């Protein structure tokens, strides 16, 4: 059917995977009610009307804690497969993991020294 016969099933799956969300969006546009007045235009948060404005001061410390968390969370993702296959891996893989952990400890010490982990 196509130039690469081994990929017919994959191409069919890809077409179906692309068509399903498009079909869902088109169906929603056709079936959804068209009312644009009254209650529909009001904003709400968690089922309640908001009080005050939406612009508030956001403490940058949340951002720094989140960034440090993401860095060390990704470290866990990289170290988990190594820990699972620890018995099959040799000494070289152990040394590589130690170097990886050492680099991350240097990054943690740097963040600590710069005050990224202090809440003030």
From Swiss-Prot:
Subcellular location: Cellular thylakoid membrane
UniProt keyword Cell membrane present: no
Assembly information from the UniProt record: NDH-1 can be composed of about 15 different subunits; different subcomplexes with different compositions have been identified which probably have different functions.
A single BP term in Gene Ontology: photosynthesis, light reaction
Organism of derivation: Synechococcus sp. (strain CC9605)
Physiological role: NDH-1 shuttles electrons from an unknown electron donor, via FMN and iron-sulfur (Fe-S) centers, to quinones in the respiratory and/or the photosynthetic chain. The immediate electron acceptor for the enzyme in this species is believed to be plastoquinone. Couples the redox reaction to proton translocation, and thus conserves the redox energy in a proton gradient. Cyanobacterial NDH-1 also plays a role in inorganic carbon-concentration.
Name of the protein in its database record: NAD(P)H-quinone oxidoreductase subunit 3
Superkingdom, taxonomy of origin: Bacteria
InterPro entries, alphabetized: NAD(P)H_OxRDtase_bac/plastid, NADH_UbQ/plastoQ_OxRdtase_su3, NDAH_ubi_oxred_su3_sf
GO molecular function: NADH dehydrogenase (ubiquinone) activity; quinone binding
Membrane protein topology class: Multi-pass membrane protein
């Amino acid at each position: 059917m196509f130039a690469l016969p081994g990929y017919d099933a994959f191409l069919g799956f890809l077409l179906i995977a692309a068509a399903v969300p498009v079909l869902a969006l088109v169906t929603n546009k056709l079936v959804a009610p068209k009312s644009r007045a009254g209650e529909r235009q009001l904003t709400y948060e968690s089922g309640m009307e908001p009080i005050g404005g939406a612009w508030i001061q956001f403490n940058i410390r949340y951002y720094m804690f989140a960034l440090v968390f993401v860095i060390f969370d990704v470290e866990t993702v990289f170290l988990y497969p190594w820990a699972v296959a620890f018995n099959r891996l040799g000494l070289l893989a152990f040394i590589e993991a130690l170097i990886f952990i050492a680099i991350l400890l240097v990054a943690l010490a740097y963040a600590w020294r710069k005050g990224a982990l202090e809440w003030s």
